[in-house]
Amino acid sequence: MKRDIFNIFILFIFWTIIYTSDMGYYIYKFEIDQNDNISLHTSKYVDSKLKPSKLKKHIHSSIVYEIKNNQNYTILKGEIDNPKIIHFEDFANETPSKTEVVLDNAFFVVKIPVDPDMYKIEFYKSDGAYKKLNEIKFINYKNNTEREIFPVTDIMVNGDNSSRVNIVFLGDGYQQNQMHDYISDVQDVSSALFNTAPYSNYINYFNVYAIEVPSEDSGTDHPATAPDCGGYNNDVFYADTYFDSSFDLYNIHRLLYIQDQSAAFDVLADNMPDWDIIFVMVNTPMYGGAGGTFAVFSRHSTSTEIAIHEIGHSFAGLADEYWAGFNYAGEYANMTANNNPETIKWNAWLYDNDIGIYAHSYPGNEWYKPHQNCKMQYLGPPFCSVCVEHTIKSVYEILEPINSYYPENLEVTVPASEIVSFGVDPILNVPNTLSINWFVDNQLVAENNNSIILETSMYSLGEHEVKVVIQDFTDLVRNDL
């Protein structure tokens, strides 16, 4: 008996084809020392699908890695910010400023899909030049099966981790009897973030978790050794905390960061391996923090705004819109050396919502920004339209706008006289601006429906193509991906 064959091709605007695996993935933890030598510390296997990592690089120095087989063929390539570089942004003064610090050593992780051909990883440093650092062979390296499990609180869960951007909080300096304070602090930051556009519009695309890691002592370290401690010179305190956070690092009073990065990665790998964005909240009201591999901030009243500003860097890859220095200058969605209104990258927004071509302050006045009062410049204002647009595009670079589709097989064989159903479960934005249209053999058959039912008797015997196209027609985006 002849049958009709329907091939489903689920096509989405912003779909990105990437290398991945259904066999799980490994989290490899590496250390890079003061001479840029890299060593492998641990590997942990995760039995779930690895989604693409598209977190943006936003500093001038990065580490490029290549996974190769034993024929020296590259099967996977990636790039991360140089983990030794952290930055401190000071919004306490009228004019924000940024200070860069290079750590003596740092830890970082690479999530690698399982591939039986994987043989070695090569590391390169890219900071204007391109220099090979070293290579490490995976052969005979044992997977670390030890786990240290902590409670994980669901702050906001909108779907499976594999189809969401997962924000994970770690707390430092919270004792066991202060975990309710920690969760409350995290909820405050999460609530502030998702009441901020465009995160409020795309809230359903995110999950938020808090790992409850108790410290021996409450608080953090402030040795009062930085020359800029000012009125805090006599305010000396120490605390035995799980991630060893401290002020006064690298002689900057307000530079607050965790010194045991290795422990932080172990906690993440053991308890929430699907993390995409990491926030570390330190239990002190004193102003401070730093950005880098970890976004670290205190319980100061500005912490929520600092966290939202920082996610603009780490998630959306946005530049600061105050002049941070030539180390941070470059071509970004919201920064350019081009001041031609016809060709500038935010041309589609020009002169709407106060979007213009504004020179940075001297000596960076040959670099331009789109707005004069954006959250990437000051704490408090909303993101400008250019930053909103690029944040939305960053969401779609990581995720497809669906939870699931059916049938799961992309090739379906049915008798010529039967009925067959196709459907998708979309991830809706707020307000919903998704359009879901269905096509058979490139002919539109249904508009704005999550599913269709086809009577195969209406089609000739043989092969037909069923296609669903999901598009986001939000007016917050004017430039397609």
Question: Language-model segments: which ranges?
Answer:
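Extracellular glycoprotein-like low-complexity segments
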Residues: 21-148
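Exposed beta-strand face motif in extracellular beta-rich ectodomains
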Residues: 117-119, 462-467
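Active-site recognition of the HExxH zinc-binding catalytic motif
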Residues: 304-321
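Solvent-exposed segments in extracellular or luminal domains encompassing
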Residues: 450-463
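Propeptide-to-catalytic entry region of secreted or membrane-anchored zinc metalloproteases
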Residues: 64-86, 144-267
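Short pre-active-site segment immediately N-terminal to the catalytic Zn-binding motif
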Residues: 179-182, 287-308
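Catalytic zinc-binding patch centered on the HExxH motif and its immediate surroundings
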Residues: 219-222, 261-297
